[in-house]
């Protein structure tokens, strides 16, 4: 919401459902969700909303220096989803909020930690004024992490090995 009011040209957001109103309540009320024209007509209008993206998320992320990366669930130790890794694979610096012990798994030099700021405005100022050298250092740290042993637990190979060892015994 802060970007909508203050810096509309500095944030693009994508996703499903942001262009639709959702009727809540009884089953009778929820029936209106089936009327696409009505849900689109009543939907809130966001200046920053760019629609849903049908291609590969990593290809889209490559077009941006930064991406807000907010987990759907916060406060669960060790809960790290693909969101931050999509940014890493695109060499887009994540602005992260979610796992409280993220730095036990991923080096702090790889992302901007939203918890270090008092407001979205403060984050925006930090990102806007970041020297290119610092941005490049984030990217170098991301590359180093992706090629380190710390990344192994998050790799496809490790996931397959875990399945093989625990399910297909």
PLM segments and residue spans:
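Pol beta-like nucleotidyltransferase catalytic core
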Residues: 1-7, 11-13, 23-54, 58-68, ...
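Acidic/glycine-enriched connector segments
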Residues: 18-20
């Amino acid at each position: 919401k802060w970007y909508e009011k203050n810096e509309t040209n500095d944030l693009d957001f994508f996703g499903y459902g942001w262009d639709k109103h959702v009727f809540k309540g009884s089953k009778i009320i929820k029936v209106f969700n089936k009327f696409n024209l009505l849900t689109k007509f009543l939907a809130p209008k966001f200046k920053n909303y760019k629609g849903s993206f049908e291609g590969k998320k990593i290809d889209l992320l490559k077009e941006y220096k930064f991406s807000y990366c907010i987990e759907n669930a916060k406060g669960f130790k060790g809960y790290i989803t693909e969101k931050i890794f999509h940014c890493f694979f695109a060499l887009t610096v994540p602005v992260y909020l979610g796992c409280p012990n993220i730095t036990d798994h991923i080096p702090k030099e790889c992302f901007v930690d939203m918890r270090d700021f008092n407001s979205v405005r403060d984050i925006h100022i930090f990102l806007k004024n970041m020297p290119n050298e610092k941005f490049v250092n984030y990217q170098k740290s991301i590359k180093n992490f992706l090629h380190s042993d710390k990344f192994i637990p998050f790799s496809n190979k490790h996931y397959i090995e875990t399945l093989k060892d625990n399910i297909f015994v």
